[in-house]
Amino acid sequence: MHGTEEKMKNFNMMKKLLALTLGAAMLLAVMTGCGKKDTAQEPTDDQQQQQEEQQPAEPATLLEQIKAKGKVVVGTEAQYAPYEFKDLDANFAGCDMWLAQQIADSLGVELEVVDMAFDGIIPAVQSGQVDLGIAAFTNTPERAEEIDFSDLYETSAQLLIVKAGNADTYSTKESLVGLKVGAQKGTIQSQLIQSALPESELFELEKYPALALEVQNGNIAGLVVDQAVGEALVASSNGALEVSNFTFTAEEASFGKSVVIAKGNEDLVAVVNEVINKVTADGSYQKAYDEAVELAASLGL
């Protein structure tokens, strides 16, 4: 009996030793695992530097971003022939769109055009929704406070377009006192009416075709517009519109057109200026302008 008790004691002791051994082994495994995990979470300075060097750097400037994405996005308002409009296949056309393509080609990227309300283009440029604004923008000190301008690519006079038969009726500032004179919303023409015709009532709409219809229907005395656009409106009106004999002075209304670019992008401005200086010097912009006038006329725009 004593032998049996002795055997039981030895057996129980072995069980305790085995349990202690297994517990120690498990604890060691857990500690080892934790140690490995901590080591993986905290790379050395050399490893950290190597990882940072391997990560591609984000494009810093707008010019670099354009080249990285492989396209330049241009905002315009495509109802302003001959500068920007759409052809019969709904493709963007006009001398401004031709200029946009020259800029894209110079950058070695594709051109993407976004059609939007004219008064939304500058905010879109500022926010980065589009890269450039090309929509016959007049270079003014007020706008230059918000965005940067390229060099001028065209200078044009301003016309007063009236209903056929009213060319002499509305030929002086006095003849327009108290009458509505139209312009596209957000344009320099709106400012011109307020400054040069302070006793007339400014009438604004989003689109020039709608303004032309208001003139034809006799709802407004006339509309103020760039010379090329005004001549195109008259040519496509089937005799319903004509150019008034009213004239603005050169100080009032000799406006130059520029490309709109967000502030702080001098390198992109330089590229755009290089293109503008080339196409204005070699006559290719004038050729594109003449072709745009012909195309717009053939489309009745």
Residues covered by each model-derived region:
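A ligand-binding cleft/hinge motif common to bilobed small-molecule-binding domains
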Residues: 120, 137-145, 192-195, 216-217, ...
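Ligand-binding clefts/hinges and TM-proximal coupling segments of bilobed small-molecule sensing domains
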Residues: 39, 55-58, 188-205, 242-248, ...
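Extracytoplasmic small-molecule ligand-binding "clamshell" domains
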Residues: 45, 57-136
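Acidic, polar ligand-binding/catalytic clefts
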Residues: 101, 105, 110-175, 248-250
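Bacterial lipoprotein signal-peptidase II cleavage site
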Residues: 31-44
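Extended ligand-binding regions for polar small-molecule ligands
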Residues: 46-52, 97-106, 180, 185-187, ...
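Periplasmic-binding protein-like
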Residues: 155-162, 235-274, 296-301
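Short helix-initiation/N-cap motifs at beta->coil->alpha
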Residues: 112-123, 168, 203-217, 228
